Amino acid sequence: METQRLRIAMQKSGRLSQDSQALFKSCGLKINLREQRLIAHVENMPIDILRVRDDDIPGLVMEGVVDLGIIGENVLEEVQLIRASQGQPFAVKTLKQLDFGGCRLSLAVPDDVTYTGPQSLAGKRIATSYPGLLKRFFDEKGLSFKSVMLGGSVEVAPRAGLADAICDLVSTGATLEANGLKEVEVIYRSKAVLVQAPNPLSDAKQKIIDTLLPRIQGMQQARESKYIMLHAPKDKLDAITDLLPGAERPTIMQLAGETNQVALHVVSSETLFWETMEQLKALGASSILVLPIEKMME
């Protein structure tokens, strides 16, 4: 009999693992992920968390071994391209792009090499762990190159004489700089995504997903929003409201003992910069507070 516990695969270590754990916690899942176990059970919901290698997650989701997976778009796209080149079917459903795991896949060359565009690497040796994405980029340019497949430490390839350039994930660029390389072109930008198995799930599992998705959406909206409170003169309300970025219609309340002053409360979907606060003050606003929001649900 098929278990009715929802199975979610996540990366077993690294930054994406830490961000996934934080997401589970913020969604109210009680789970002990400190012990090095393959499967961890959520205490307050019928969910099991599987911790695996990131490049195993797309296959586990597609084959229905797990119901959901948290994976970088770069890994997902690479697996899809490689399978397509081998004539193997691949289908998963992306439920939501998440607000973490951001990175970019970039070309990099030695510092002393002049780069004038992708054509300057035509016919050159390029080391990478993402041959599918790299080939697609050069195919779209109508250019050929020699792929040097490396599973790790791609950045040392030019210095070791294995390649003329590299194509690797970049976050700060510090690793490239330490190896005498410079980033010259971004070929793919990626974030983490929540993906689902292609086949329909049971009603019980779908109900769990329908509970999780609004929580994830609420957490992401909360991180992107601020709660703003201020006092404002009545005759300046329109001008003050126009200054609040991405704001919905505000809540207006009469201040006790004040006939010309009101309290204004609003959720803003954008950052309120110091310059905006100074403009609000210049219009007569006072007691301006900008507060973080922990959770939201529309």
UniProtKB/Swiss-Prot annotation:
EC number: 2.4.2.17
Annotated keywords: Amino-acid biosynthesis, ATP-binding, Cytoplasm, Glycosyltransferase, Histidine biosynthesis, Magnesium, Metal-binding, Nucleotide-binding, Transferase
Activity modulation: Feedback inhibited by histidine.
Protein name: ATP phosphoribosyltransferase
CDD domains: PBP2_HisGL2
GO biological process terms on file: L-histidine biosynthetic process
Keyword Zinc-finger: no
Subcellular location: Cytoplasm
Family of the protein in this entry: Belongs to the ATP phosphoribosyltransferase family. Long subfamily.
Function: Catalyzes the condensation of ATP and 5-phosphoribose 1-diphosphate to form N'-(5'-phosphoribosyl)-ATP (PR-ATP). Has a crucial role in the pathway because the rate of histidine biosynthesis seems to be controlled primarily by regulation of HisG enzymatic activity.
Annotated metabolic or biological route of this protein: Amino-acid biosynthesis; L-histidine biosynthesis; L-histidine from 5-phospho-alpha-D-ribose 1-diphosphate: step 1/9
Cofactor: Mg(2+)
Catalytic activity: 1-(5-phospho-beta-D-ribosyl)-ATP + diphosphate = 5-phospho-alpha-D-ribose 1-diphosphate + ATP
Top-rank taxon, per record: Bacteria
Any GO molecular function: ATP phosphoribosyltransferase activity
Cited InterPro entries: ATP-PRT_HisG_long (IPR020621), ATP_PRibTrfase_cat (IPR013820), ATP_PRibTrfase_CS (IPR018198), ATP_PRibTrfase_HisG (IPR001348), HisG_C (IPR013115), N-reg_PII-like_a/b (IPR011322), N-reg_PII/ATP_PRibTrfase_C (IPR015867)
